[in-house]
Amino acid sequence: MHCPICHHRAHVVYCAHCINTSPSLLLKLKLDLILLKDENKELNGKVEQILNEAMNYDQLDIKRMEKKKDPLMNSLMKLDVLRMKKNNNLIRHRIEQLNERIYSKRNHISELKVEIDNYKCYKVGTGTDKLREQVEISDAKNKLAQVSKICESARDYKLNLLNNWFVIQKLQDNFQIPFAIAFQPLISLKNFRILPLAITNDSINIMWKYISFFSDILMIKLPYTNKICEQPMFEFSDSIQTVVQRLIKLIINILQICRHLKLVPSTPMDIPWLLDQYDVDGLFYNMVKRNKMKCRSVSLYWTFGMLYSMVLDNMNNPQRGHPARRTAPPPTVTGPHDRWYVVG
């Protein structure tokens, strides 16, 4: 073929049909292909030999390598040397980094050792301070326990003197008046109907005096105080409703003191059941003797109005437990000088 521009001969190009159908063209091309394959095999063998010698050059004789001066082998050897130098440089740089890290860690360890020594000294000082503080706390607790025992002994002594002063005693031969205070009957819901109003009011006054002294010794504040001025019996003119109200306030104060002494629980109590079991005089006597009392728990606290209605029911009903009208009982008719005492 000739170039249509420069008219020089160029490579001949045949179509696929001519190559497959022309025997002369097919044979020539096949022979060329066989020659090329043979040349490639020879070149492949040489390349493999050169590569093998280049990889194992440290095991070959130096003189033999000098006799054979193949440029490909020399290039490969130089490439391998450069690669080894590069690896050596990387290893050297890595070693330097590790040395710097080891040096910094050594400095950090030495600083930590110094801090540990300082902390040990501080800990020893702190331990000594804590031990001294614990000793002081223990001494303070011992002193507080001793003071508490002294205060408790003084309180018990004062309460015993108070009991002896008011002559609180339990009578064995009287069912309606089982307890006495200052040689007078302790008021209760059972004997409220049979005692004269003057005796009832006088008994409540004495119980109020005792409760006031008792709360002063215990150093507690009561919910109610006795604000009514004391008068002689023949001049007393309070109504029965006022006496009942004072009695209810007295019951509330007694329960408050019993809660403080842990004779009854601080939770809401079934006060009607408690009064049915102990009555007012029983509550007062157990408070004086500091005896624990059994009681039932309820969900709500009793109010003054609820207690007032309940006390009226108990006083109006001699059998205690049956419904009755909620009116105050009529006072017993007494003379101005009708005053008597129960002597145990």
UniProtKB/Swiss-Prot annotation:
<protein>
    <recommendedName>
        <fullName>Autophagy-related protein 14</fullName>
    </recommendedName>
</protein>
<comment type="function">
    <text>Required for cytoplasm to vacuole transport (Cvt) and autophagy as a part of the autophagy-specific VPS34 PI3-kinase complex I. This complex is essential to recruit the ATG8-phosphatidylinositol conjugate and the ATG12-ATG5 conjugate to the pre-autophagosomal structure. ATG14 mediates the specific binding of the VPS34 PI3-kinase complex I to the preautophagosomal structure (PAS).</text>
</comment>
<comment type="subunit">
    <text>Component of the autophagy-specific VPS34 PI3-kinase complex I composed of VPS15, VPS30, VPS34, ATG14 and ATG38. Interacts directly with ATG38.</text>
</comment>
<feature type="region of interest" description="Cysteine repeats">
    <location>
        <begin position="3"/>
        <end position="18"/>
    </location>
</feature>
<keyword id="KW-0175">Coiled coil</keyword>
<dbReference type="InterPro" id="IPR023261">
    <property type="entry name" value="Autophagy-related_protein_14"/>
</dbReference>
<dbReference type="GO" id="GO:0046854">
    <property type="term" value="P:phosphatidylinositol phosphate biosynthetic process"/>
</dbReference>
<feature type="coiled-coil region">
    <location>
        <begin position="25"/>
        <end position="156"/>
    </location>
</feature>
<keyword id="KW-0813">Transport</keyword>
<keyword id="KW-0072">Autophagy</keyword>
<dbReference type="InterPro" id="IPR018791">
    <property type="entry name" value="UV_resistance/autophagy_Atg14"/>
</dbReference>
<keyword id="KW-0653">Protein transport</keyword>
<dbReference type="GO" id="GO:0051365">
    <property type="term" value="P:cellular response to potassium ion starvation"/>
</dbReference>
<comment type="similarity">
    <text>Belongs to the ATG14 family.</text>
</comment>
<dbReference type="GO" id="GO:0034727">
    <property type="term" value="P:piecemeal microautophagy of the nucleus"/>
</dbReference>
<keyword id="KW-0926">Vacuole</keyword>
<dbReference type="GO" id="GO:0034271">
    <property type="term" value="C:phosphatidylinositol 3-kinase complex, class III, type I"/>
</dbReference>
<dbReference type="GO" id="GO:0032258">
    <property type="term" value="P:cytoplasm to vacuole targeting by the Cvt pathway"/>
</dbReference>
<dbReference type="GO" id="GO:0120095">
    <property type="term" value="C:vacuole-isolation membrane contact site"/>
</dbReference>
<keyword id="KW-0472">Membrane</keyword>
<dbReference type="GO" id="GO:0006914">
    <property type="term" value="P:autophagy"/>
</dbReference>
<dbReference type="GO" id="GO:0000407">
    <property type="term" value="C:phagophore assembly site"/>
</dbReference>
<dbReference type="Pfam" id="PF10186">
    <property type="entry name" value="ATG14"/>
</dbReference>
<dbReference type="GO" id="GO:0000425">
    <property type="term" value="P:pexophagy"/>
</dbReference>
<dbReference type="GO" id="GO:0034045">
    <property type="term" value="C:phagophore assembly site membrane"/>
</dbReference>
<dbReference type="GO" id="GO:0016236">
    <property type="term" value="P:macroautophagy"/>
</dbReference>
<dbReference type="GO" id="GO:0000329">
    <property type="term" value="C:fungal-type vacuole membrane"/>
</dbReference>
